[in-house]
């Protein structure tokens, strides 16, 4: 029996039959029965015609189910409520909410470390109108601070007079900002229209739901996630970002032969004046170099002569914006991102295993080695150990990240430029690494890979780590529901075959491919 249009538009009896089929399935068949139930009522975030008659049946089924199956049903009820979270008078959401007494009663019989608790907390997070009641009940569980702060945030209503936007993922509790950072947030929030504030608030909420849902779904299927090794919080250690080391064009000059103007693709002149910028004669433009960062997005034309100092000062101001972002990312955000995007809740992939892969697979031929989308430099340091810092150039579009990188690795020059139009000559690079970054520009990933193929010398390696979609539609939804500043419509990952096709079209041959969960590690080589 298949889930077809009869099920999707059927009666409450049909819905009840599907719930009973799930309840009666042998342990080995639970996941398949759950898949059939999910597909009958929900399709990638959209409700089917069977959702309304099915909702009360699923609520009843949760009452009767053992803890393992009840956890799965709680996640499904959360998905049903979420699908119409902002639809006025949604009948499906109302039908799910009518089970509130039963959810709270079931939660009262759970321990905070039991998988069912995660499923119920995700479900309850969709009903801010019951905030006080839910939080009172949950207080007995003594949830970890991160879990509690996520639930608290989802149960809050937007206060248009004092909107608290951003800084909610992976949990509001991890964001402990300085006064300067709070002022920075207030300034950008004040520039938003009421409509933009509402959109941002809802996106923040969806991000937290997506994290909670991914964690709950993993937990009810596979058990309690492995603990992330905790590093001291930047706010507790008093850690500061070392200032990017002072350096001018001299740091980049050893690689001058490989560089090209991003506008006209002509050679760049790195000059003999270490205090100057980098010049394109054909475009009559000078690009500023400040603290070892060449900014190829901010050219100053000869017609604007005299503004070079102003451009450098502007770059310095940008470097000062949210200077601790790199620290937050490496210490607190990246491990959680790997959980969601890579299904790494079991910590199968560790920093040590990533280090080992890079060290053993980056095999450069002659020419500079590019760390593409280098971020805050955690893996730039690993590449430097593998190939030598004197060969390395780090490229990214994020100035706060590059500033952190330069503070940690003063011997490595940095370039602010686009991955979609690499500022390098054809066949000039010895190797390229793009680690945990290709998904940051998913719509243009094929273009970025083509650029890598253009710039690599024959025999040079392209080593990358990124993520593919989960084959389970529920977990795939939680991956996609994450929206970040560069991708407000939601996270976009890849299919493995898509990556292989792009690499082949760029003239590269895959030499190794591996990865647990939804990770993919690939090393390709530029063909002759």
Give the ranges of each region predicted by the language model.
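Short alpha-helix
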Residues: 490-506
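A short acidic, Gly/Pro-enriched loop at the edge of an enzyme's catalytic core
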Residues: 420-432
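A short SAM/SAH-binding and catalytic strip from SAM-dependent methyltransferases
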Residues: 430-444
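Conserved class I S-adenosyl-L-methionine
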Residues: 297-363, 463-490
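N-terminal auxiliary segments of SAM/dcSAM-dependent transferases
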Residues: 160, 168-321
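Class I SAM-dependent methyltransferase SAM/SAH-binding core
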Residues: 368-421
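A short glycine-rich, Lys/Arg-flanked "PGG" loop and its adjoining helix->strand segment in the class I
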Residues: 446-458
């Amino acid at each position: 029996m298949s889930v077809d249009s009869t099920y999707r538009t059927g009666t409450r009896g049909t819905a009840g039959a599907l719930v009973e089929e799930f309840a009666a399935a042998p342990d080995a068949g639970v996941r398949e029965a759950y898949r059939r139930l999910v597909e009958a009522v929900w399709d990638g975030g959209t409700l089917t015609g069977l959702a309304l008659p099915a909702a009360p049946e699923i609520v009843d089924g949760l009452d009767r189910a053992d803890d393992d199956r009840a956890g799965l049903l709680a996640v499904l009820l959360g998905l049903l409520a979420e699908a119409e979270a902002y639809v006025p008078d949604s009948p499906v959401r109302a039908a799910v909410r009518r089970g509130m007494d039963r959810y709270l009663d079931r939660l009262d019989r759970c321990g905070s470390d039991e998988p069912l608790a995660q499923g119920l907390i995700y479900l309850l997070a969709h009903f801010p109108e019951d905030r006080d009641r839910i939080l009172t009940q949950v207080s007995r569980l003594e949830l970890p601070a991160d879990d509690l702060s996520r639930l608290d945030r989802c149960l809050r209503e937007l206060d248009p007079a004092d909107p608290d936007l951003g800084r909610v993922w992976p949990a509001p509790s991890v964001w402990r900002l300085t006064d300067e950072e709070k002022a920075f947030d207030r300034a950008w929030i004040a520039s938003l229209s009421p409509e933009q504030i509402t959109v941002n608030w809802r996106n923040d909420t969806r991000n937290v739901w997506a994290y909670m849902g991914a964690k709950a779904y993993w937990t009810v299927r596979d058990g309690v996630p492995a603990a992330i090794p905790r590093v001291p919080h930047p706010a507790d250690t008093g850690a500061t970002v070392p200032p990017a080391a002072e350096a001018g064009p001299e740091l980049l000059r050893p690689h001058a032969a490989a560089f090209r103007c991003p506008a006209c693709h002509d050679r760049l002149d790195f000059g003999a004046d270490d205090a100057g910028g980098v010049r394109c004669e054909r475009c009559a433009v000078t690009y500023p170099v400040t603290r070892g960062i060449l900014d190829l997005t901010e050219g100053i034309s000869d017609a604007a002569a005299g503004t070079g100092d102003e451009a450098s000062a502007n770059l310095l101001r940008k470097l000062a914006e949210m200077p601790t972002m790199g620290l937050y990312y490496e210490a607190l955000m990246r491990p959680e991102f790997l959980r969601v995007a890579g299904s790494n809740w079991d910590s199968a992939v560790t920093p040590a295993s990533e280090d080992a892969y890079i060290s053993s697979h980056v095999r450069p031929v002659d020419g500079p080695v590019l760390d593409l989308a280098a971020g805050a430099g955690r893996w730039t340091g690993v590449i430097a150990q593998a190939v030598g810092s004197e060969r390395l150039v780090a490229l990214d579009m994020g100035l706060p990240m590059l500033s952190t990188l330069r503070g940690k690795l003063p011997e490595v020059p940095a370039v602010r430029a686009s991955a979609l139009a690499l500022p390098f000559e054809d066949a000039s690079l010895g190797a390229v690494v793009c680690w945990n970054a290709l998904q940051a520009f998913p719509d243009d990933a094929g273009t970025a890979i083509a650029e890598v193929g253009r710039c690599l010398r024959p025999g040079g390696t392209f080593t990358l780590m990124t993520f593919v979609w989960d084959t389970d539609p529920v977990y795939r939804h939680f991956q996609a529901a994450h929206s970040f500043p560069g991708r407000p419509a939601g996270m976009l990952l890849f299919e493995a075959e898509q990556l292989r096709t792009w690499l082949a079209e760029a003239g590269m041959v895959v030499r190794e491919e591996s990865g647990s969960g939804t990770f993919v590690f690939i090393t390709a080589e530029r063909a002759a």
